[in-house]
Amino acid sequence: MPKIVVVGAVAGGATCASQIRRLDKESDIIIFEKDRDMSFANCALPYVIGEVVEDRKYALAYTPEKFYDRKQITVKTYHEVIAINDERQTVTVLNRKTNEQFEESYDKLILSPGASANSLGFESDITFTLRNLEDTDAIDQFIKANQVDKVLVIGAGYVSLEVLENLYERGLHPTLIHRSDKINKLMDADMNQPILDELDKREIPYRLNEEIDAINGNEITFKSGKVEHYDMIIEGVGTHPNSKFIESSNIKLDRKGFIPVNDKFETNVPNIYAIGDIATSHYRHVDLPASVPLAWGAHRAASIVAEQIAGNDTIEFKGFLGNNIVKFFDYTFASVGVKPNELKQFDYKMVEVTQGAHANYYPGNSPLHLRVYYDTSNRQILRAAAVGKEGADKRIDVLSMAMMNQLTVDELTEFEVAYAPPYSHPKDLINMIGYKAK
């Protein structure tokens, strides 16, 4: 009976193990998870903090006991894989509760250890990061126990923006700082102005080109010379792959610690796969490498690896499109395709429209800004971005499908919109992009 070992029990690992069991009722499957919880919804965590998700239990899909009862898959939490011997096909596991170590053999090994939050490294009892449900509980308990009011949020990526919004909606008083003037880097820089407008509208303080110089209790000294007091600090300064334990093996890592994989999510070592935040692949629509540490990619990779292990060796990954979206107060920011800083590798043109998300005469209309970049050599779409109070998600998903099928910008004129006044226009914004590009 084949033995399958999975490292990591969140989006990628737990999903992959579950899909393998659906296809293969006999294999022995065991998952090692170094932290307390398995199968929690990472994307729900800011909303748990903001009490939008009313009970944290809704962010936790399974416990190890429930997972075993439903799927006959063993999950060992607080068990950290600390080394891989790919020649003997074993992993070394540390029981973090007892500090005991043991070896576990495998026939197939699936690596889905995820990533960890970066930290600025200050010694501080009021500083937190947000990466898992344990972090969420710690933040929530600290807020309640210390009657937290003023919170400093560091960083201006998706997670920091979501955390800030949820702290504000909870009734706290957040302040945002960011070390540069380039916020929300997945979006075009000039499309991010509504973020600052939303902060101004609510009189939420923010400072760009600002960093912490020192923390002394609740007193924060900044590089600008300002000294302010905060009850709590939440750092959102990026992540790094949990790949340190892989260095003991023959598995290839890139310079940032990610694992390059092929279209079957195989590593360079036989019988070892990598999925989720730790794996790097390529774009679907252009010939460039891509790392997209988001939920869709982890789930898609999990399904492909499960099919492979179950015997379907014809299924392959066709690449990422990098579709992403975030809500920040009243606005939605969405984009798909290559990142803004990757456009320079192409000879491209840009076309954009700004008009109401639905028919102008229908109540509640608001402007939607839609932008598309296309390759001048073949007129295929390289990237699209949308910002507005409604309709951004719909347009970006349509453009994602267009890019998936390598449509040209001109073919957007042929998109047949589901039109009614509350939803769109007879000639939708997507159609108008195509007409303007001609």
Swiss-Prot record:
Cofactor: FAD
Assigned EC number: 1.8.1.14
A Pfam entry, by short name: Pyr_redox_dim
Record's keyword annotation contains Flavoprotein: yes
Residues bound to NADP(+): 151-166
Keywords assigned by UniProt, alphabetized: FAD, Flavoprotein, NADP, Oxidoreductase, Redox-active center
Other comments on record: Reduction of disulfides occurs by a thiol-disulfide exchange reaction, but involves only a single catalytic cysteine residue that forms a stable mixed disulfide with CoA during catalysis.
Subunit structure: Homodimer.
Family: Belongs to the class-III pyridine nucleotide-disulfide oxidoreductase family.
Protein name: Coenzyme A disulfide reductase
Species name: Staphylococcus aureus (strain N315)
Gene name of this polypeptide: cdr
